[in-house]
Amino acid sequence: MAGRSKGMEPRLAGAGCAPAPGLDWQNDGAAFYPDAALSILPHLDALAASYPERHAGIRLHGHPALAAVLPSLTRIAGHYIGPEARPVRAILFDKSPGTNWSLGWHQDRTIVVRERREVPGFGPWGRKAGLIHVEPPFAIIERMTTLRVHIDDVPANNAPLLIAPGSHRLGRIAEPEIPAAVERLGILACLAQRGDVWAYATPILHASAASVGHAQRRVLQVDFAAQMLPGNLEWLGV
C-alpha cells in the first residue's frame, strides 16, 4: 500500500497522564501514553489470567478486576471527551501462536446497550457473546474515545494496531471508499511496550495483521462515552 507508513517509537518522553509528543489529537485522532498502565499491570495480569487462552476477543462485563484498572483510564479518556467520560465497553484481545488472526481496515460502528428499544436511527441490532449490540447514529461514535492498554510488548512483528491518522474527521466512511482513504492518509503502526496505553478517536480507521512471531499479544480495549443515549436506551457499561 502506498502512502506514508511509519512506526511510533514506543518509548517517547512523557508518562502517566501526559501524552507523548509527536501526534496531534485533533488532526491525527490518536495519542500515546508511555508507561501509563505500569501501576495497574498486576490487575491486568489477573484479569487476563482469569480467562482461558485461545479466545480471540472476550467481551467483559462485571469483572471485579476492572474496578481497579478503570479509574486511571477514565482520567485519560476525560482529556478528550470531558469529565463525564465513563467506560461503556471492554474487550480483552489475546493473539498468540494458537489464536492468531488479521483484521481488515474498518471503523468501529456499534455500541452495547442494556436492552433493545426501537429508537429512530439505531440499527441494525445483533448479539455478540450474549450482549446486545446496535449501530447508532454515527454522531454518537464521533463523540467517543477508545483506549488500548498493552499487557504485552507489541513490536512490529507482533501485530500492532494500524491506523489511518486523520480518518476520524471523515465521518462514516462507505466500505468502497476505505482503501482510498487509507491510501491518501497513510498508515501509522502503533508499537508499544508492556504498560503503554494508546488512545484513539473511536471512528478512526484501523486494521491489524496477523502476528508473525511467537509471542503473546494481550490488549485490554475500553470504549468511553460521555453522552446519554436517546429514547430510554442505556449503555450497558462494564
Model-derived regions, located:
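Non-heme Fe(II) oxygenase catalytic core, chiefly the N-lobe of the double-stranded beta-helix
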Residues: 9-28, 36-194, 207, 211-215, ...
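Glycine- and charge-enriched low-complexity intrinsically disordered segments
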Residues: 237-238
